[in-house]
Amino acid sequence: MKTFFENQILHLDLHGIRHPDVEIIVQDFVLSHQEELPLIVICGNSAKMIQIVNQALTKIKVDFEETRY
């Protein structure tokens, strides 16, 4: 897990994180940095990872948009 600023936006890179750990990492990241919105979570191309992140954000009632690059 790596966090970094790019264009003054804080990013969380989930490459290398195991699926069972993703939910708590994402929720902690968002809740810990909610005063710095917007935030970006990088999931990679794994449909499962994207699904887990979407569910994690939905559980804590965070509005988000999914963007693919």
Functional labels for PLM-detected ranges:
Residues 1-69:
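Long, charged, low-complexity intrinsically disordered regions
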